[in-house]
Curated annotation (Swiss-Prot):
This is S-adenosylmethionine:tRNA ribosyltransferase-isomerase. The keyword S-adenosyl-L-methionine applies. The gene is queA. HAMAP family: QueA (MF_00113). Keywords: Cytoplasm, Queuosine biosynthesis, S-adenosyl-L-methionine, Transferase. GO terms for biological process: queuosine biosynthetic process; tRNA wobble guanine modification. PANTHER family: S-ADENOSYLMETHIONINE:TRNA RIBOSYLTRANSFERASE-ISOMERASE (PTHR30307:SF0). Pathway: tRNA modification; tRNA-queuosine biosynthesis. It is found in: Cytoplasm. Monomer.
Amino acid sequence: MKLSDFDFNVPNALIAQYPSSERDNSDLLIAGTKHIKTKFYNIIDYLKEGDLLVFNNSKVIKAKLHLGKNITINLNKKLSDNCWGAFAKPARKLNIGDEFYFDTHKIIITEKLAMGEIKVKFILNNISMIKFLDKYGEMPLPFYIKRTSSVCCSNMALFCDHDNTLKITSISHNSNTVNFRSTDSMIDSTNDNDRYQTIYSQIEGSVAAPTAGLHFTKDILDKLKTKGINTAFVTLHVGAGTFLPVKTENIHKHKMHTEYCSITAETAEIINKTKQKGRDIIAVGTTTLRTLESSCNNGIVKAGNFETDIFITPGFNFQIVDMLLTNFHFPKSTLFILICAFAGFKEMHALYKYAIKEKMRFFSYGDATLLYRKV
């Protein structure tokens, strides 16, 4: 199939810039011969006792850093204790050896790769990487969610968004060195630090949120337990590559970035027992689905830590997941291609057409849909 087969138009007005007033107050579209539009807090009505919801418990880190010169980097993947792969915008303004200072801490550009990808080295002064990012970084919101503005004046610039404020205190043009200091002024009116994180996130490492889980509240999790619906957790650290476009018309020539996954023995056991009993496995998000389908062999989920670059396209043989809870995805994206593989090409085009007609909210902060595997 061609990339153009997965194209459709989403009106800009439907791209959610902010989350719903409450996590579970977003809309939920149940796919079927007759689609059902309801509120997310009603999802329990569409699940059965003995079913298993599998969540991705990865936690989003503040992976976006301002380097000055109107340059930002989004960390993508940890390569070693102090080295990371990242995406720079615009990368053309960076040179190997450039140094950027955040108070007494330093970032060095060590390598430039294709498509804006770079490698950086962190030299930190008595601070952990996570604490450094908590202090100087920002939530890595997707590019289509608009928050940041900048005001530049001679050799000083102020970067401000609704979560955090960073100030460049000096720029040394000769040495390509930029000095930063953090400020105590935190602007959090949109609450992105909270709402771009699932309530059950535990293991730090994602640079984009597994957004299907953003709708869940403690109340919903409690009600699932009361109804006898089981839960389990896997880990997939979402990389910045999740936002990279497919650039080949032949979709099978697209290469996915690798992402770290982990499945505990306890989780593997409960999934396999659920399958043996003939109950449904519901993946909360495409990251969970990709983790489960990457880990299985002959219908059995294997525990362990591994990396996956799985790209699921129509014709894929799903072995584990029966239902998929996910948000609405970009046209011509790997994730829209995935749901077409899972729930049917014609069916997903029709579902999205219906969602647009109903003015449902799209993408990371948007509404959710519950899909059934096409058999």
